[in-house]
Regions:
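N-terminal helicase ATP-binding lobe
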Residues: 1-160
Length: 160
């Protein structure tokens, strides 16, 4: 079923550390504008909802209302409170997937090679796969690409 039978250890994420990073980065936002005050209220409600039991929740907020970071706050707090091993973040449109992943990485202080966030969808990584093993591609880049492929096959990353 898997292309590569090598063992890949599961990656551990420290939810509390990620929450602290997110909180620290969110402090830099302008708290005086009306829209940011509303975004902060939405985020705080999501953060508090993170302590609820596991279930299906809906976040209905207009465009520009801060859904991306509010829902990440919920997910991280919920994972911490309920002992979840991973977060699976489902987005309805491919067009916003890369943007959301970039926001997550930026706000959590993670680089593109981080093993905490995995961007997994039908075309993820295809831009790199044609270069794998070609001249000009370093062994380190090839190793990172193999690791990304294994992670996507086995979902060993904590924030998908």
């Amino acid at each position: 079923m898997f292309r590569d039978k090598r063992e890949v250890s599961s990656i551990r994420a420290d939810w509390l550390e990620l929450i602290c990073r997110l909180d620290e980065n969110m402090k830099s936002f302008d708290s005086t504008s009306e829209i940011n005050k509303i975004r902060q209220q939405i985020t705080e409600q999501c953060r508090q909802a993170g302590s609820r039991k596991t279930g299906i929740y809906r976040l209905s907020v207009p465009t520009g209302g801060g859904k991306t970071l509010a829902s990440l706050n919920f997910a991280l707090h919920h994972a911490l409170e309920t002992g979840k091993r991973r977060i699976i973040y489902v987005i309805p449109y491919l067009s916003i997937t890369s943007q959301t992943v970039a926001t997550f990485r930026n706000m959590l202080g993670l680089d593109a090679d981080s093993n905490i966030v995995l961007e997994h969808y039908s075309t993820a990584g295809l831009q790199n796969s044609s270069n794998t093993g070609s001249a000009g591609t370093s062994e380190e880049e090839n190793a990172r690409e193999r690791q990304r492929k294994l992670a996507s096959e086995r979902w060993i990353i904590r924030l998908l």
